[in-house]
Amino acid sequence: MSVMRGILVLLVGAATMAATITVAAGQNAQPDKGEQIMNASCTTCHDLRLIQVQALDKDAWTNQVDTMIQRGADVPKDDIPVLIEYLVTHHGPMPDGPGKNIVLNVCTMCHDLSRVRRNLATREDWEDKLGTMLNEGAPLSEQDFPIVLNYLAKNFKPQ
């Protein structure tokens, strides 16, 4: 193998490994189009938290986006379906049950709901994660801890 070919193989391997690590860590090099639209169109007037705590379905997000456009939000017509799909995927409905409102109002103080959705875990793992959050200052009461734990363990567990 020539020196140039060897260098090329090393560079391709390093790039592939870096891409794999980035994807494995759940980090995109660039936000997706829906997130870009949301940041440009929604968060110019609203704090992201207002979006995070709603957890709406497709019809409700469609109505919300239409209302905001009527009130002056600048969302290009072709971007509306992309924005709605993003909102449903990342800020869509959460399963009903005891603990839902606590998750919506407490966990979203620091986390996007998509973080909860993608972190499927066993009950023990959720307990550890919640304990870590408490140690980092999450405003979760002793009374609410088991309610949230039960909600997460029931609805966001490995398949």
Question: How would you name each of these model-derived features?
Answer:
Residues 1-7:
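Positively charged n-region of N-terminal signal peptides that target proteins for export
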Residues 7-20:
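Bacterial N-terminal signal peptides
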Residues 22-37, 50, 67, 77-102, ...:
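Electrostatic cytochrome c docking/interface patches
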Residues 39-48, 83, 104-114, 148:
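The canonical Cys-X-X-Cys-His
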Residues 49-79:
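N-terminal, post-signal-peptide region of Sec/Tat-exported proteins
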Residues 54-59, 119-125:
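Short cysteine/histidine-rich zinc-coordinating motifs and their immediately flanking basic loops
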Residues 62-73, 127-139:
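Short microdomains enriched in Cys/His and/or Lys/Arg
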Residues 90-118, 125:
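Surface-exposed, polar helix/loop patches in the mature regions of secreted/periplasmic/lumenal proteins
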